[in-house]
């Protein structure tokens, strides 16, 4: 089963996915790293200190990689971790964070003020959640505000375990749309 773990930068995707990889031995594709390592991008955006992913190249590369991971007998889950994961997977978990807290997280990373504000605004207007609705069949939402990566990983596990066991009805608390941070837009 391929699951996307997406969200605005700073919501905890990488920390959570690393915990799940260690605890559950689920395979993780850190998409942003893959894009950079395999040059699956069209250009370097110097201003944003990032690359512009070539989604066609990404989509053509992933099936082979995922098939290899799924061949391992004990592996039932592959997690695609990236703020772009919702463009690729049919099932996605969107990690969210209250924008003022998100700003603090991104400032600690040393992001420029412009990049911090751009990401906080994107989170305020539910940008990735809205895109996930457009691209994905199943969307779940987890609030990471004031929570540890371990706590958030527990929620991700619950969602994935429920999906694997066909008990999706147990996931109402993760239904998208419960978080509204529009008031945090400056």
From Swiss-Prot:
Catalytic activity, EC: 2.7.4.3
Keywords: ATP-binding, Kinase, Nucleotide-binding, Ribosome biogenesis, rRNA processing, Transferase
Assembly and oligomerization: Interacts with uS11. Not a structural component of 40S pre-ribosomes, but transiently interacts with them by binding to uS11.
Top class in the EC scheme: transferase
Protein name as it appears in the record: Putative adenylate kinase
Keyword Kinase: yes
Region spans: LID: 108-118
Any one Gene Ontology molecular-function term assigned to this protein's record: ATP binding
Reactions this protein catalyses: AMP + ATP = 2 ADP; ATP + H2O = ADP + phosphate + H(+)
Similarity-based family: Belongs to the adenylate kinase family. AK6 subfamily.
Pfam family, one: AAA_18
Region (NMP): 30-53
Positions bound to ATP: 10, 12-15, 109
Gene Ontology biological process terms in this record: ribosomal small subunit biogenesis; rRNA processing
Function noted in UniProt: Broad-specificity nucleoside monophosphate (NMP) kinase that catalyzes the reversible transfer of the terminal phosphate group between nucleoside triphosphates and monophosphates. Also has ATPase activity. Involved in the late maturation steps of the 30S ribosomal particles, specifically 16S rRNA maturation. While NMP activity is not required for ribosome maturation, ATPase activity is. Associates transiently with small ribosomal subunit protein uS11. ATP hydrolysis breaks the interaction with uS11.
InterPro entries xref list: Adenyl_kinase_AK6, P-loop_NTPase
């Amino acid at each position: 089963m391929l699951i996307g773990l997406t969200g605005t930068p700073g919501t905890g995707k990488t920390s959570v996915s690393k915990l799940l990889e260690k605890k559950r031995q689920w395979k993780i594709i850190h998409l942003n790293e893959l894009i950079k390592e395999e040059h699956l991008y069209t250009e370097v955006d110097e201003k944003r200190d990032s690359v512009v992913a070539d989604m066609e190249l990404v989509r053509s590369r992933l099936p082979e990689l995922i098939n290899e991971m799924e061949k391992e007998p004990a592996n039932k889950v592959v997690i695609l971790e990236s703020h772009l994961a919702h463009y690729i997977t049919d099932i996605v978990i969107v990690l969210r964070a209250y924008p003022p807290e998100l700003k603090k997280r991104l400032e600690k990373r040393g992001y420029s003020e412009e990049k911090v504000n751009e990401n906080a605004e994107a989170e305020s207007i539910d940008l990735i959640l809205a895109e996930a609705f457009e691209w994905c069949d199943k969307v779940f939402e987890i609030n990471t505000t004031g929570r540890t990566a371990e706590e958030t990983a527990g929620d991700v596990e619950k969602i994935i375990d429920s999906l694997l066991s066909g008990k999706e009805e147990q996931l109402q608390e993760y239904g998208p749309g419960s978080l509204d941070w529009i008031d945090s837009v400056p």
